[in-house]
């Protein structure tokens, strides 16, 4: 009985950013990504709809590892098509620990820095053909999950 009581008293639930901070975090992420594009004289991206990206971020928050496949085994392109979108899509994923909105902003900056060090992720960020980025974000359990779906939209 003592073990159960001590476990209850000392169980640790990490702080997480409030889900209401997600819109501001998405705006921040778009600015960080566009800052990288500007450094390389590439047109800034516009904000995408983020429906598929948000769903994937929420799914990934419940998983132990990052994956481009959703709970039904769909790839980013398939999820994008199921959402009624057309065109090319490429996806970058990241997860970082953060306990509040400011720490999550730092995590976003670090995630984009890491992506710029990875050849495929960097190519997605700097691809001049890309026109939009749909940013999915989920916070909980002391972490932020980021899904960046880079899109080529022809209007």
Please describe what each predicted stretch is:
Residues 1-11:
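Hydrophobic membrane-insertion alpha-helices, especially the h-region
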């Amino acid at each position: 009985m003592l073990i159960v009581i001590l476990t209850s008293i000392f169980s640790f639930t990490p702080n997480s950013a409030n889900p209401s901070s997600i819109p501001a975090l998405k705006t921040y992420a778009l600015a960080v990504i566009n800052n990288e594009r500007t450094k390389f004289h590439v047109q800034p991206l516009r904000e995408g709809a983020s429906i598929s990206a948000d769903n994937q971020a929420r799914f990934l928050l419940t998983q132990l590892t990052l994956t481009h496949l959703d709970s039904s085994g769909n790839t980013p392109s398939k999820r994008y098509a199921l959402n009624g979108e057309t065109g090319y899509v490429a996806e970058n994923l990241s997860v970082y620990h953060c306990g509040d909105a400011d720490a999550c902003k730092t995590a976003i900056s670090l995630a984009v820095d890491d992506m710029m060090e990875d050849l495929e992720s960097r190519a997605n960020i700097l691809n001049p053909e890309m026109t939009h980025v749909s940013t999915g974000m989920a916070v909980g359990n002391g972490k932020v999950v980021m899904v960046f779906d880079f899109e080529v939209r022809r209007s």
